[in-house]
Amino acid sequence: MKLPIYLDYAATTPVDPRVAEKMFQCMTMDGIFGNPASRSHRYGWQAEEAVDIARNQIAELINADHREIVFTSGATESNNLAIKGVAHFYHKKGKHIITSKTEHKAVLDTCRQLEREGFEVTYLEPAANGIIPMERLEAAMRDDTILVSIMHVNNEIGVIHDIDAIGELCRSKGIIFHMDAAQSAGKVPIDVQATQVDLLSISGHKMYGPKGIGALYVRRKPRIRLEAQMHGGGHERGMRSGTLPTHQIVGLGEAAAIAKAEMASDDARIGALRDKLWNGIKHIEETYINGDAIERVSGSLNVSFNYVEGESLMMALKDLAVSSGSACTSASLEPSYVLRALGLNDEMAHSSIRFSIGRFTTEEEIDHAIEVITQSIDKLREMSPLWEMFKDGIDLNQVQWAHH
């Protein structure tokens, strides 16, 4: 068993060897290395065909038309293109946008930039289970609302939003609906024909594809218009200029095809491992699951261990590659803004760990993880004066701490 055990699949996934193999065939002189935009020779035609196949594979994963897939450098760019693209194109219709406080930074910071440009953004508060209540969303809608951006699956707590209901509500009000599907594409079934989602962001490296590639689904009927954010040769029907990276796109396509074929079996196996992990640690006193216990993606488990300091817990769990929030913000010692939005206090938010399980996780690794977690919590609490006070029946909320 290789240590540390990788339990951070929500941060990134390893490239599936079958994907890597396909990618390598598009890189060297004896492979499909041409520029897909080179229309005058065979090297370009072959590359264009490889890109077309991948575009179809991604479209099939979400039941879209291949002409609705725009390649980007990843979900961050897809989110930027969707949100800024809509805001800049439809600004005469209205300048109000709705999102939630628990979105990924790629959505929140894009919205903050638009606020600097004169747009108004409403940041919805989730319920305690991490899900945005529909009545809260509807109450925030106005005549000048042009866009709602709500993620499908949360990257920190793994809860799943009811996108059918959100899509239906937005369509009935004539509001464009963007969904960040970085954590759900390839893991949860998505059917854009059945769901009234207008824009959908996809990331390659969250579903066993390469980093640096993603896609944005842009609905054709009813047609959604975007203002390009990247200008140049007019690639991707003018929505995203830049030479298409054939090997990256082929990797994303293959990852999508594998995900579609193996989604049900992956989901069942990963879900069983997640349940095994939770059942192995839930007996530990003062241990709480964050986010909805039912409406969640199979590989995600965010747990707070009360009276244990987050950073010391991370160090104690050195045999496990886990995180205390999203990878994008884990360098900061601030408590997770997602958990704070759920109503957790700073101490509970600080003592939380995100375990995310994936395609290559084994049962043996989960058994070892349970052992490591149990021993580490026991050891840290033995050294904790707060734990001792709690065990003595002292209500720590009533303690008046002296400031020196």
UniProtKB/Swiss-Prot annotation:
GO terms for molecular function: 2 iron, 2 sulfur cluster binding; cysteine desulfurase activity; metal ion binding; pyridoxal phosphate binding. Transmembrane segments: none annotated. It holds the Pfam family Aminotran_5. Keywords: 2Fe-2S, Cytoplasm, Iron, Iron-sulfur, Metal-binding, Pyridoxal phosphate, Transferase. The keyword Iron-sulfur applies. PROSITE patterns: AA_TRANSFER_CLASS_5 (PS00595). It catalyses: (sulfur carrier)-H + L-cysteine = (sulfur carrier)-SH + L-alanine. The active site is at 328 (cysteine persulfide intermediate). InterPro entries: Aminotrans_V_dom, Aminotrans_V_PyrdxlP_BS, Cys_deSase_IscS, Cysteine_dSase, PyrdxlP-dep_Trfase, PyrdxlP-dep_Trfase_major, PyrdxlP-dep_Trfase_small. Its EC number is 2.8.1.7. Belongs to the class-V pyridoxal-phosphate-dependent aminotransferase family. NifS/IscS subfamily. This is Cysteine desulfurase IscS. It comes from Shewanella baltica (strain OS223).
